[in-house]
C-alpha cells in the first residue's frame, strides 16, 4: 500500500488500467476474478445495482484476458495464474447504446466496425449486425489461435430506458437478432460475461444460452463487487482516520457512520457478508463527509417508471418477502415491484427461510433517497415547491427548535390528507402518519412508526444526532393536543429514551379531522 500522502481514491474511475497505472487505491478482487474465470463455466451473468463496480470488474476481466500481468503485480492473482495467455476480447458497453432501435443499431455497428478494422474484416454492404458479430468472433479466434472472451456490460440499459415506450419491442428484437450468435459460436468462445441491473428474459441472452450461469446469488461471488468491512480495514484505514479527524469523530464513530449510511447489502442467502456501496463509500472517504451520493448520481431515475403508487406502498417494502423462484429467475417486467427494487439496489436480502427471501432497505442512504423520490407525488407538488420548507424543517428539528419547525411541517402537510385521492381508503390518522413519516425520512432523519414499548405504542419516534422526538398524533375530534399529551404522560412514553445522551422532546400533535392539515403541536413537559 502506498503512503497515505501519495494515495488517490478512484472516485468515479471504472478503468482497472488507469487505477493501476496511476497508483489509485485498489481493493484487490483478483482472487475472486480468477476463480470466476477458471471454474469451468463459460457463460456467466451478474446482476448488481447501479454504481456498484460492475464496469470496473469488466475492465479487470478484459485486462486479465489481454494477458497484462504487469498491471496485476502485487495482487492475489499472481499467486494463482501460472500461464498468462492472451485471448482476443470483444467488449460491448450497452449503456452507450441509447434507448431506441436506431441508437442500439448505431452503437453496435460502430463497435463492430472497430473490431472489423482490428482483424482486417471486410463485410459486404448491407450485412446484418448478426452476420458481422458472427464473422468477428470466428475471425478473431482463427487469426489469434485463441478462443474469444466476450464481455457485455450494462446489457439492460437500453431495455430499462425504453420500457413502457413504443420503442421497447423494437429494442428487444435487436437483442434477439444479434445475441443469438453467442450460442451459435460456442466453439470459438473462451468466456462470456454479461452484467446488468434488471433481468429481461424475453431477449436471446437468456433464452438461447441454456447454460448461462447466474452468479448473482452465489456465495463465492457475493463480494465480487462492492467493499466489505474487512476490506475497509485492509485498504482504507488512513482515509477512515483522516475522515474522523476532520469531523471530530473517533475511528469507531467514523466506521459506525459509514456503516449506517452505505453498508447493508447482501447478495446470497447464507453466510451473508455485509457489502458497502463502493461509489458512495469512496466518495465519502474522499470528501471526508457523509452525503447521499447514490441518489445524486441518478440512481433513482427509473424508480417511478417500474413501481406504481410507490408513495403509498413504500413503507410496506422495508419488511417484505419474495419467493426464491421469482427473485432468482423471473423477468423484471412481470416479477412485481419487490423484484425490481431488489435488483436495482433499493432493497436487499435480510434473511432466507424455506424458499422465501426476506427483503428490506439496506441502509440510511437508500432509505432517504427513496422517500425523497416519492415525497413530491405524495404531497402532490413539484420538488422545487417543497424543497425550501423541507430545508427549514430539517434545520429547526436538527437544532431542537420544535416550535419553529411546526410552521414548515404545516406547509408541507397542508390539505394533502384530504386532496390526495390515493389515500382515500386509509383511516385519516393513518394518512397523517404516512405523510409525516415520509417527510421525516425524506429529510434524512431516522423514523420508527408505531414503536412498541412496555407501556404502549408510540405513533412515531424521530431521531437526529442530538435529539429524540417522541410524537403522538390525535385528530381534533379525538381530543387533539390534550388527549395526545395525556397519553404521552400516562404511558410514560419518554421513559425508554432517558438513558440516551440525546435530549428527548415529546410532541403532542393535533390534526384536522377532515384532512386539512396540522392544527398545532405542543412540547410536553416531562417529569
Regions of interest found by a model, annotated:
Residues 1-428, 443:
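Phosphate-binding site recognition
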Residues 140-144, 439-465:
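Active-site metal-binding core of divalent-cation-utilizing nuclease and nuclease-like domains
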Residues 149, 467-469, 505:
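Structural motif
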Residues 169-175, 475-494:
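Mg2+/Mn2+-dependent nuclease catalytic core
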Residues 178-185, 339-347, 437-442, 487-507:
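Metal-dependent nuclease catalytic cores in nucleic-acid-processing enzymes
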Residues 436, 460-462, 466-477, 491:
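Conserved catalytic cores of phosphodiester-cleaving nucleases, focusing on short active-site segments
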Residues 496, 500-527:
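Domain-level recognition of nuclease-like catalytic cores that cleave nucleotide substrates
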Amino acid at each position: 500500500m502506498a503512503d497515505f500522502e501519495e494515495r488517490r481514491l478512484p472516485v468515479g474511475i471504472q478503468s482497472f488500467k488507469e487505477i493501476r497505472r496511476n497508483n489509485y487505491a485498489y481493493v484487490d478482487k483478483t482472487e475472486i476474478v480468477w476463480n470466476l474465470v477458471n471454474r469451468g463455466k463459460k457463460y456467466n451473468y451478474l446482476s448488481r445495482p447501479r454504481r456498484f463496480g460492475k464496469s470496473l470488474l469488466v475492465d479487470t476481466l478484459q485486462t486479465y484476458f489481454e494477458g497484462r500481468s504487469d498491471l496485476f503485480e502485487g495482487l492475489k492473482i499472481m499467486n494463482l495464474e501460472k500461464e498468462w495467455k492472451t485471448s482476443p476480447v470483444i467488449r460491448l458497453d450497452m449503456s452507450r447504446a441509447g434507448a431506441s432501435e436506431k441508437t442500439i443499431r448505431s452503437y453496435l455497428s460502430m463497435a463492430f466496425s472497430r473490431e472489423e478494422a482490428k482483424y482486417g474484416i471486410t463485410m459486404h454492404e448491407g450485412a446484418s449486425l448478426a452476420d458481422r458479430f458472427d464473422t468477428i468472433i470466428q475471425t478473431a479466434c482463427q487469426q489469434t489461435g485463441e478462443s474469444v472472451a466476450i464481455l457485455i456490460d450494462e446489457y439492460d440499459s437500453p431495455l430499462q430506458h425504453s420500457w413502457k415506450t413504443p420503442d421497447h419491442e423494437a429494442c428487444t428484437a435487436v437483442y434477439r437478432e444479434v445475441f443469438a450468435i453467442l450460442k451459435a459460436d460456442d466453439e470459438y468462445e473462451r468466456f462470456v460475461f454479461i452484467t446488468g441491473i434488471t433481468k429481461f428474459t424475453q431477449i436471446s441472452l437468456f433464452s438461447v444460452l441454456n447454460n448461462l450461469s447466474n452468479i448473482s446469488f452465489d456465495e463465492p461471488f457475493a463480494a465480487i463487487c462492492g467493499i466489505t468491512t474487512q476490506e475497509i480495514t485492509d485498504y482504507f484505514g488512513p482515509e477512515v482516520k483522516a475522515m474522523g479527524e476532520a469531523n471530530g469523530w473517533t475511528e469507531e464513530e467514523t466506521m459506525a457512520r459509514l456503516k449506517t449510511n452505505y453498508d447493508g447489502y447482501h447478495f446470497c442467502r447464507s453466510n451473508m457478508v455485509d457489502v458497502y456501496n463502493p461509489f458512495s463509500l469512496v466518495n465519502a472517504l474522499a470528501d471526508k463527509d457523509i452525503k447521499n451520493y447514490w441518489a445524486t448520481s441518478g440512481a433513482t431515475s427509473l424508480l417511478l417508471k417500474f413501481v406504481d403508487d410507490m408513495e403509498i406502498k413504500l413503507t410496506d417494502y422495508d419488511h417484505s418477502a419474495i419467493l426464491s423462484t421469482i427473485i432468482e429467475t423471473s423477468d423484471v417486467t412481470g416479477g412485481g415491484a419487490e423484484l425490481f427494487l431488489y435488483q436495482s439496489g433499493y432493497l436487499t436480502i435480510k434473511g432466507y427461510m424455506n424458499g422465501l427471501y426476506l427483503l428490506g432497505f439496506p441502509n440510511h442512504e437508500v432509505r432517504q433517497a427513496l422517500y425523497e423520490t416519492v415525497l413530491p407525488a405524495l404531497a402532490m407538488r413539484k420538488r422545487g415547491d417543497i424543497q425550501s420548507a423541507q430545508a427549514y424543517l430539517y434545520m429547526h428539528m436538527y437544532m431542537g427548535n420544535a416550535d419553529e419547525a411546526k410552521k414548515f411541517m404545516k406547509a408541507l402537510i397542508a390539505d394533502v390528507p384530504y386532496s390526495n385521492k390515493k389515500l382515500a381508503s386509509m383511516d385519516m390518522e393513518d394518512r397523517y402518519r404516512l405523510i409525516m413519516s415520509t417527510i421525516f425520512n425524506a429529510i434524512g432523519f431516522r423514523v420508527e412508526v408505531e414503536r412498541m414499548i412496555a407501556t404502549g405504542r408510540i405513533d412515531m419516534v424521530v431521531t437526529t444526532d442530538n435529539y429524540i422526538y417522541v410524537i403522538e398524533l390525535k385528530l381534533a375530534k379525538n381530543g387533539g393536543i390534550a388527549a395526545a399529551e395525556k397519553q404521552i404522560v400516562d404511558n410514560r412514553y419518554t421513559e425508554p429514551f432517558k438513558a440516551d445522551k440525546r435530549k428527548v422532546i415529546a410532541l403532542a400533535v393535533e390534526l384536522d379531522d377532515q384532512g386539512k392539515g396540522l392544527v398545532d403541536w405542543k412540547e410536553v413537559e416531562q417529569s
